C-alpha cells in the first residue's frame, strides 16, 4: 500500500476552480473518480489527515499511487464528465448500482428491421425498449394478451429465417398472434407501426387505444359488419384486462418515477416505481455496496446519473417528474442535465403529503424488503468466497491478496485447430468482460507445453506493451483533454470531454496464474514469465484426476483437502476455462469443416458467396461460367467476377487432376 504523502500534490499546484479528479493505482488503473466545486479544498481533504478518514476512503487513498484532475467551466460540466469517466473506467471505489436480476423485462427490439417482442433479463441492449420488470407469470400473460391486439413478431431469428425461406408462417401466424412479416402479410413499415403501438400502450397510452377501438367497433356495427365488431370487442376486453392489472395510484395525468432507499452502514437498496398515466407500469431495483463514503443526497445523485445516463435512447424514458426521498446534491445541475436528455423540463421533488408521499412510503417498504432478501442470499456467498481466497493464499504461501486470478487452458483434437482460453476471476467472481481466446499455430501448436508457453508469452507481452503505452502520470499536474494543437490547460466543451480514451486490453496483471495441467505446463508458464522479466505474478497448475496443485520447479504437488473451499474455487476456475476453450475450439473446427474454395477469392464475402451458389446452383457450374455469366449474379461486378475466374483457375492448376474411376469395376479410366 502506498503512502499518500508520496504522491500528494503541492497545495499551490491545485486550482480552486470546479473540476473532476481521478485516483490511479500503481498499474495506472483508475480506482476512483470524483468532482468538486473547489478542487484544492476537496483534494486537500484526502491528504491533510489520512488517519482520520472513514475506513473506505482511507483504503482508497492508500491503494492509489497518483492523482490527476481536469478543470471544467461549470458544475454542470463536472457532473457530465464525472458520469462519463465512471462509465468508462468503472472505478472500484465508486458507487455502482447493480440491477436486481430477479424479475424479467418485456422488451421490444426496435433496432431490428422487424421488431420483436420478447422476455429479457440481464444487461440492456441499445435499440431495445424495456417495460417492467414483472413477475415471470404476469409478463407472459400480459405478452400473450397483447399479441391478440398488436400481432408483433415474437419468434427467434432462426424461426423467422426458416419461415421466410419456406414461405409458410409459424403457428402464431396461423392463429393471428403474429402479423407474419416473414411471408409478406404486412410490410416492414406496417409491422413497425404495430410495434410502436405496442410500446405506446405499455408506455401509458392505454386509454387512447381503447377509445380508438371503441369508435372502430361502433363504425363496424353501423355498417352491419358484426364479425369485425365482435373481433374489436374481444380486443377491447383484452386491453382492459391488461390495463386493469395496474392499480390507479396517482392522478391519471401523472407520469413520474418514484425512488426510495433503505440503507445500512455497508449497503443501500433502491427501488423505483414507474408511474405512467397514474398507474404503476413497472418496478426496478438495485443494491449498491457503499465503497464510497457517500451521504444519501450523493447516493441519489449517482443513482439518477446511472439510471438515466445508461441508455443513449433515454429521451422517451424520462418522465416529467422524479420523486426522491431527499433532494440530490447538485440539485439544479441535475435537473438541467435531465431536462437536456428529455428535451423538456424535468422536476426533481421530495413529496411531503398526499398520494405521492403515500406511494413513496410503499416504495420504501419494498426497498427495505429487497435489502433483507439480498443480505440473506449473499451472506453465505461472501463468507465462502472470502474463505476460499484466504485458504488459497495460505496454502500456496502467497504474500499478497488474490484480488485477480487468471486461468489458461489449451483445447484441440489430435493437434488440429489448437486454441487457448483465458478466464478472469476478481474477488472470487468471474469477470467475463476480461475473458480472452487465442488461436495457436506453427511450432507452438505441436504440444501442450509449447502452446502454454506461447499463450502466456503473448498475454504478458500485451501487458508490457499496454503498460509502456500509458502516458506517464505526474501527480498534481493539471490534466485537460485537448485536441491536436491545443495548449495544455485549455478548457473544452462537454462534447469533447465525452470522447472515451482507447482502452488497454491487458493492462492489469493478475496476482495468480492458474494453468490446466501438471508440472510440465506449470514450468512452461513460469518460463514464459521469467523470459519477460515478470517476477510478481505467481503460477500454479491444477492437474486432472487427482486434482493436485503444482508449483514451478517443485518435485511434489500441494495436496489441498477435498473439502477445501480453495480447491473448489480452483476447480470452478479451471472448469470455466475448459468450457470457454472448448466452445472456441468447436467454433473454429466447425468453420474449418465448412471451408470452400471460394473462401480464398479476394473481395468475395459471405453474402456474395451465397449469391453465387444460389444463382448457379453448384461450384461446378461456377467454375464453368465465364466472367460475363458470373456478373449476372447479384452483387458480382466485372472485377470481382474476373477475380473468381482467376482464383478457381489457379486452384485447379495447383494440383494434379484426380483420375476418373469406374465405380463398378474400380478401373482407372484414361482421361
Curated annotation (Swiss-Prot):
This is UvrABC system protein C. Keywords: Cytoplasm, DNA damage, DNA excision, DNA repair, Excision nuclease, SOS response. The keyword Secreted does not apply. It comes from the Bacteria. The UvrABC repair system catalyzes the recognition and processing of DNA lesions. UvrC both incises the 5' and 3' sides of the lesion. The N-terminal half is responsible for the 3' incision and the C-terminal half is responsible for the 5' incision. Interacts with UvrB in an incision complex. Residues 207-242 form the UVR domain. It is found in: Cytoplasm. The gene is uvrC. Belongs to the UvrC family. It holds the Pfam family UvrC_RNaseH. GO terms for biological process: nucleotide-excision repair; SOS response. Residues 16-95 form the GIY-YIG domain.
